[in-house]
A protein has these predicted regions:
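Hydrophobic membrane-insertion alpha-helices, especially the h-region
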Residues: 7-28
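Membrane-embedded segments
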Residues: 64-158
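Secreted/periplasmic serine-hydrolase-like ester/acetyl group-modifying domain
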Residues: 140-285
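Short extracytoplasmic
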Residues: 42-68
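Histidine-centered active-site loop/cap adjacent to the catalytic His
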Residues: 4, 351-375
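Alpha-helical transmembrane signal-anchor/signal-peptide segments
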Residues: 25-46
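Substrate-gating cap/lid alpha-helix
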Residues: 305-337
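A structural motif corresponding to the C-terminal end of an alpha-helix
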Residues: 284-299, 327-336
């Protein structure tokens, strides 16, 4: 018994000694790591807090920023008029892969249990050339050093997503000027540094305890008359006096009239040759797979391309939109389809230009968000 006790005590002291030695020789690196990435980690706090608290987070692209003064733009309507907390995330070029990357960086039990996610899809993401996926510049804008540290050292997401993101970085590393260690080094190499990774995880978790504040947000049903709001939206929208397509005058004069003069109107929708070679579509499938773990199923809203403007090759575009819709429904996610195949199904004013929602389009989308999440 005494020998066993002595052996256990010796093992304990040896373990303390090993930890002490490790800390002694790595303390400078640890302090350097903490203070180097502190400011970058602070940039991750708000989105993580919102996802964990159950605030509605709407991911989108240029439609969120192109016309910032629209009354029914979600960040204006929900937060200012309804006093319902909602966060928007994204700007032009913010597409499926970087949405997946951000969610993977914050993957934890709280997020999986509470997150209320809306994804605004644009048909333009999936059209054009085969390399229609995310640009590295946009990836770096949203996956900064703090986000990458969260992803590799704290995020609880499956390794397959970490490898997926790492592979994307390595395949596009030439677009990064003077890449830092976390971008330059493949995840398979980072993963092997077990002790170093555990220490970094500990530091980030202590950072979260101090800075990440996630109080549960509850939503309560409101008495809203969306028919009245739709009529208001139609009245707000500036009348189009130089066209009968519901396109705002400035946009029509600047972008449409010159193309008509060149006999380039209406426009053709270019479709990649196959789904397998459609980068954005493949990224989208990865996003769907990732979101399967969420308790509250996400809402996807497919926007439109103006059917009076993009009329050529709309048949093939319609097949692509139907395929995208079917994939969302296969995962039992909620889907709002605002894509119109036929001109007669399009309501003038839904778009304010040829791809972005007008006030009427936003009211329709907002109604769906309220009906789905505010119960």
């Amino acid at each position: 018994m005494n020998n066993r006790l002595a052996l256990n005590i010796s093992a304990l002291f040896f373990a303390f000694f090993v930890v002490f030695v490790l800390l002694f020789f790595t303390k400078d690196r640890l302090f350097e790591y903490y203070f180097t990435y502190l400011e970058s980690l602070k940039k991750t706090v708000e989105l993580q807090s919102d996802l964990e608290s159950g605030k509605i987070v709407l991911f989108g692209s240029s439609e969120l920023v192109f016309y910032p003064n629209q009354k029914f733009l979600p960040q204006n309507f929900f937060n200012n008029d309804l006093k319902i907390p909602l966060r928007v995330q994204g700007n032009e070029g913010h597409q499926s892969f970087v949405i997946l990357s951000q969610l993977a960086a914050f993957d934890n039990k709280k997020v999986r249990e509470n997150a209320k996610v809306v994804v605004l899809l644009s048909p333009s993401w999936f059209t054009g050339s085969s390399d229609n996926g995310l640009t590295m510049a946009k990836f770096l804008e949203y996956m900064n050093l703090g986000m990458m540290n969260k992803l590799y050292f704290e995020g609880q997401t499956q390794d397959k997503y970490k490898f997926l993101i790492s592979d994307y970085i390595q395949n596009n590393i030439s677009y990064i000027k003077e890449p830092t260690f976390i971008y330059e080094t493949p995840y398979k190499d980072i993963k092997d540094e077990y002790i170093n990774n555990k220490i970094k995880k500990f530091i980030i978790e202590k950072f979260d305890e101090k800075y990440v504040k996630s109080q549960d947000i509850k939503y309560f049903k409101q008495d809203l008359n969306f028919n009245d709001l739709k009529n208001e939206a139609k009245n707000i929208e500036i009348s189009s006096s130089n066209n009968n397509l519901g396109i705002n005058n400035e946009y029509y004069s600047k972008y449409i009239e010159p193309q008509i003069a060149k006999n380039n109107f209406p426009f053709e929708i270019v479709i990649p040759p196959s789904l397998e070679k459609n980068e954005e579509y493949q990224d989208f499938l990865d996003l769907l797979d990732f979101l399967d773990s969420y308790k509250i199923k996400p809402l996807f809203i497919m926007q439109d391309l103006h059917p009076y403007v993009f009329s050529k090759n709309r048949e093939n575009a319609n097949l692509l939109m139907e395929t995208i819709k079917s994939k969302v429904l296969e995962h039992n996610f909620e889907y709002m389809d605002m894509w119109t195949y036929k001109k007669e199904d399009y309501e003038i004013g839904t778009l304010t230009d040829i791809v972005h929602f007008g006030e009427l389009g936003w009211v329709k989308a907002n109604q769906k968000i309220v009906d789905y999440f505010v119960k």
